[in-house]
Amino acid sequence: MYQPVALFIGLRYMRGRAADRFGRFVSWLSTIGITLGVMALVTVLSVMNGFERELQNNILGLMPQAILSSEHGSLNPQQLPETAVKLDGVNRVAPITTGDVVLQSARSVAVGVMLGIDPAQKDPLTPYLVNVKQTDLEPGKYNVILGEQLASQLGVNRGDQIRVMVPSASQFTPMGRIPSQRLFNVIGTFAANSEVDGYEMLVNIEDASRLMRYPAGNITGWRLWLDEPLKVDSLSQQKLPEGSKWQDWRDRKGELFQAVRMEKNMMGLLLSLIVAVAAFNIITSLGLMVMEKQGEVAILQTQGLTPRQIMMVFMVQGASAGIIGAILGAALGALLASQLNNLMPIIGVLLDGAALPVAIEPLQVIVIALVAMAIALLSTLYPSWRAAATQPAEALRYE
C-alpha cells in the first residue's frame, strides 16, 4: 500500500470526486482565500518597506543619525579622540558642531539647523552641492551653504549675507540677553530633493564652534553613521565612553518614523484578517467534510487506521490548502509588487511619471508564508480531532 497512507488519503480528499463539483469548489475556496490574503499582505508591506527605506535614505541619510557628545555641552577631541569611539553598528565617525539657529536676511527670517563640518571630510550632502565645493568652507571666512528651499525662503542668492543667531548660546549685556550671532556669506546651495533642503545649512566646523561659544578646539561631538539607523533603540543601549552621552535622530524625526512604523503594522494587521477569514473557511469546509465522510472514516477505522492516522488525513487536507495558498500568494505578491509601477499607469492610478517605492524583503515574504501555513495548520486541529473521535458503530448504524 502507498505509504504514508494518511498523506495519500488526505490528498485524495483534497482533490475531491469529479462528480462533487461544489465540494471541490468549497475545498479550493480556502486555498484561494489564503492566496489572496498572502498576496495582498506581501504587496502592501513591500510598498510600506519602500516608503520606509525612502524616508531613511532621503532624511536619515542626510542628517546626523547619532552624535556622541559630552555631558558638559561641548566635547574636547583630545579627551575623547576618534580612536576611542568604538561602538557596535557604527561604520564611520566624524567631528561635528551643530545647533538650532535663527537666520535673518534682508527680506525674511527663518529657522534652521547648522551643521559645522570638516571641509576635508566628505559629507552626505556633498554630491548635491550646486556650483560650490565643500572645500570653499574655509575657517575664519564664515561662509555658509544653504539648502535651496531655505535660500528661497530667505530670498538670498550667492554672494548675499545672512545673520545667523544661536538662541542657546546667548550672552548677557547691559541691554539684556542677546543670542550669539554673526554675519555669514552665502557661497552656494545644495539640492537633495529632500525636506532637509528646507532647514539644513553647512558651515566650517571652526566657525560653528566659535559661534556656539565653545572653548577653543571643542566641538558638539562625534557624528556617527549607523549601519541600520532604524535599529537605533538597541544601539543606544550599549556602553558608552565615560563622560559621554548619546543623541540620535529620534530627537528630531522620532515621531515621523514612529507614525510610519505604526501605519505599516496596522496595514499588516488589517490585511492579516483576510488570512484569518480564510483559516475560518478551512475550519468550516473541513468540518462539513468530516460530517460527510463519517461513514468512510468508520470504514477506515475498521481497516486498522488509528485515531492519530485519521486525524492526520484531515490535517493533510486542510494544511495542503494553506501550503498551496501561502506559496502561490507569496509568489504572486512578490511578482505584483515588482511590477506594480508598470501596472499602475495602465489603470490610471499614477500620473506624471510618479512611482511607488517598492522594497521586497525575501525574509519578510518567507515569514508571511510560514505564518499563513501555521495558521492553516492550526485551523485543522479541531475538525481533525472530531474526525478521529468518530465511533465506527455509531457512524455505520445508518449506512
Swiss-Prot record:
What are the UniProt keywords, alphabetically?
Cell inner membrane, Cell membrane, Membrane, Transmembrane, Transmembrane helix, Transport
Q: What InterPro entries does the entry give?
A: ABC3_permease_C, Lipoprotein-release_system, LolCE_TM, MacB_PCD
The protein's superkingdom reads Bacteria
Is this entry keyworded Nucleus? no
* Compartments in which it is found: Cell inner membrane
Regions that span the bilayer: 25-45, 270-290, 310-330, 358-378
Signal sequence residues: none
Keyword Phosphoprotein, does the record have it?
A: no
The GO terms describing molecular function are: lipoprotein releasing activity
* Single GO cellular component term: plasma membrane protein complex
Q: Name one GO biological process term.
A: lipoprotein transport
- Membrane topology, as annotated: Multi-pass membrane protein
Chief location of this protein within or outside the cell: membrane
Q: What does this protein do?
A: Part of an ATP-dependent transport system LolCDE responsible for the release of lipoproteins targeted to the outer membrane from the inner membrane. Such a release is dependent of the sorting-signal (absence of an Asp at position 2 of the mature lipoprotein) and of LolA.
Q: In which family does this protein belong, per the annotation?
A: Belongs to the ABC-4 integral membrane protein family. LolC/E subfamily.
The molecule here is called Lipoprotein-releasing system transmembrane protein LolC
Whose protein is this, by species? Escherichia coli (strain K12)
Q: Which gene encodes it?
A: lolC
